């Protein structure tokens, strides 16, 4: 039924909750898995810097996003190398990608380009203001994906939990 799964990860333990589900589906159907960690595109970083987004260096006339983008790419590759071994140890065929771009759009595009037949990802379970402020990559992927999407809900932890 499924021969190729795409699993988007953002580096969080919450996103990694999808791995056990992807592994189970891959083992059941003999499917291969592509792990994808979308990193920031240079033009996105420049736009965020110009807007004064929190945590982004202040925009200046000579802002060069290359070091930030390269560092994020290196971190993403290192992260995925560690994750890949967990799946390979169970006999699942795994590849990785670290494309640059807007997460939801890039996930949908790569799914289409790779011919993946199922996306397995988590949703952080935000609602109301949290969803409005942070948006929802999972929601956008669900609405635009060219294939079924298996969403694993991860509850947001509150202080004291």
PLM region descriptions:
Residues 57-78:
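A short acidic, glycine-rich active-site loop
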Residues 18, 45-49, 108-109, 131-133, ...:
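Short, well-ordered secondary-structure micro-motifs
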Residues 98-106:
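Charged docking surfaces used in two-component/phosphorelay signaling
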Residues 79-95:
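A structural motif corresponding to the C-terminal end of an alpha-helix
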Residues 1-63, 90-95, 114, 154-157:
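Small/aliphatic-rich secondary-structure junction motif
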Residues 6-7, 25, 33-35, 79, ...:
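Short, structured motif recognition centered on aromatic/hydrophobic residues
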Residues 112, 118-140, 158-161:
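Glycine-rich, Arg-bearing micro-motifs that act as flexible, cationic patches
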């Amino acid at each position: 039924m499924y021969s190729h799964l795409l699993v988007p990860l953002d580096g969080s333990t919450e996103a990694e909750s999808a791995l056990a589900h992807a592994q189970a589906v891959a083992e059941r159907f003999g499917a291969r898995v592509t792990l994808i960690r979308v990193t920031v595109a240079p033009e996105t970083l420049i736009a965020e810097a110009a807007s004064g987004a929190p945590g982004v260096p202040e925009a200046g006339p000579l802002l060069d996003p290359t070091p930030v983008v390269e560092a994020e790419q290196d971190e993403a590759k290192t992260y995925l190398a560690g994750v890949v071994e967990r799946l390979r140890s169970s006999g699942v065929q795994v590849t990785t990608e670290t494309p640059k771009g807007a997460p939801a759009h890039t996930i949908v595009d790569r799914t289409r380009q790779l011919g993946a037949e199922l996306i397995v990802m988590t949703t952080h379970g935000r609602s109301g203001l949290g969803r409005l402020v942070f948006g929802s990559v999972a929601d956008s992927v669900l609405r635009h994906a060219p294939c079924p999407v298996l969403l694993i809900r991860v509850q947001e932890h509150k202080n004291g939990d």
